[in-house]
Design a protein with these regions (language model features):
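Short glycine-aspartate micro-motif
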Residues: 9-13, 74-78, 163-167, 289
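Short glycine-rich, Thr/Ser-proximal phosphate-binding strand/loop in the N-terminal lobe
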Residues: 9-51
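Glycine-rich phosphate-binding loops at beta-strand->alpha-helix junctions
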Residues: 18, 283-304
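Glycine-rich phosphate-binding loop plus the immediately following alpha-helix
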Residues: 41-48, 128-229
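Phosphate/pyrophosphate-binding loops at sites that engage ATP/ADP/AMP, CoA/4′-phosphopantetheine
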Residues: 58-76, 272-284
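Short beta-strand-loop/turn "lid" adjacent to the catalytic site in phosphate-handling enzymes
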Residues: 66-140
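Adenine-nucleotide phosphate-binding core of ATP-dependent small-molecule kinases
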Residues: 227-274
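Glycine-rich phosphate-binding/hydrolytic loop that grips phosphoryl groups
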Residues: 300-303, 316-342
Length: 342
């Protein structure tokens, strides 16, 4: 086994604006992380991945040197996320769902990029939905990065039940997993970006004082009222009602914090509608929902999903593990990869 001659591996994750490199022992001990404020947005803006390459190179060098190591001791770098896209380091085609951890390991794309580092980089493919002949494009979706997060989460949940992992962010992801723990597809929304734009660049910016809900200001009642308003009145009308409440209500309901929570509920209704009308999982009532992410989406999505009653159960995920989910999932695939080469 190649890894047996080395003592460490690195997992590398690049997103829109940031890159993270994590150091691990071959046995799975997490040793630390280095970050770089560079991502695929830089490539999109520059028309070249030169800046991204430089940032990744510096990040990897710092990680290795700060640990008192050399690249000769690194068995490989396992890269996931948008780094495998056309605005990353190297574009690698998606896997087609369904896909298990072993499938990702078997389909790893190895590459030598000496202008980035002297160690082979093993690119972990993203996933695209399977599209049956004659099916509409509305059933197609893609992800790069959330698949490794999902594989990490699956280590903490038993096989034998179907899951949907809800991973909020700028782009919200619903990742569907069958009872054999294979990823069967995903569903993407723009909820995070919508919330940011409405909060800062619409007439409602005044009502919410251009502020987002935090874990300290979260109000379940206001979120659910906004959620139900969007269900009953439609998205646009529910949004404008925030301004009406601000102008004509008194007390708590006239506060910017109430308005921000109400707005969160209105926007999250889009996610629930998308889930309800999805074509990947027809038996939502038997599916376990796991919400993993940061506040206020963690509480907001848990509450509106529970209120909607679409899923068998809805659970919040929390962990004290110091490594990010993406790194833990990439390490799992690395382990499968090395074991498959024995």
């Amino acid at each position: 086994m190649v890894a047996a001659m080395k003592h460490y591996i690195i997992t590398l994750d690049t997103g829109t604006t940031n890159t993270r490199a994590c150091l691990w022992t071959i046995a799975g001990e997490y040793l630390g992380m280095e970050k770089a404020a560079a991502g695929v947005r830089d490539t999109a803006i520059d028309g070249s991945n030169h800046r991204l390459k430089q940032a990744v190179r510096t990040c990897l060098q710092s990680l290795v040197e700060n640990a008192g190591l050399s690249f000769q001791e690194i068995g490989g770098i396992f890269a996931s996320g948008m780094i495998t896209s056309n605005v990353g380091l190297l574009e690698v085609p998606h896997l087609t769902a369904p896909a298990s951890a072993d499938d990702f390991a078997r389909q790893i794309y190895p590459a030598e990029l000496p202008d980035v580092c002297p160690v082979p980089i093993y690119f972990i493919r993203g996933v695209k939905n399977a599209l049956a002949e004659g099916a509409a494009l509305k059933d197609m979706d893609i992800m790069r990065g959330e698949e490794v997060e999902t594989l990490a989460l699956l280590q903490e949940y038993p096989a034998g039940a179907p899951y949907v992992f809800i991973l909020p962010g700028s782009h919200g992801k619903f990742v569907f997993v069958d009872d054999g723990q294979a990823i069967t597809g995903c569903l993407t929304t723009l909820t995070g970006e919508l919330l940011e734009i409405i909060t800062t660049h619409t007439i409602l910016a005044d009502a919410v004082e251009r502020s987002f809900v935090t874990s300290q200001t979260y109000c379940r009642q206001a979120v659910l009222e906004g959620f139900h308003a969007a269900q009953e009145q439609g998205f646009g009308r529910a949004l404008f009602s925030i301004r009406i409440q601000k102008m004509f209500s008194q007390g708590q309901r006239a506060s910017s914090q109430w308005a921000a929570n109400y707005l969160l509920g209105v926007v999250l209704e889009n996610d629930i509608s998308a889930l309800k009308n999805n074509h990947l999982c027809k038996d939502l009532g038997q599916t376990v929902g796991i919400v993993a992410g940061k506040e206020p989406f963690l509480s907001g999505l848990t509450d509106v999903l529970t209120e909607a009653g679409l899923l068998h159960t809805v659970q919040k995920y929390s962990s004290q593990h110091p490594a990010p989910l993406s790194a833990r999932g990439a390490f799992l695939i690395a382990k499968c990869f090395w074991e498959g080469r024995e």
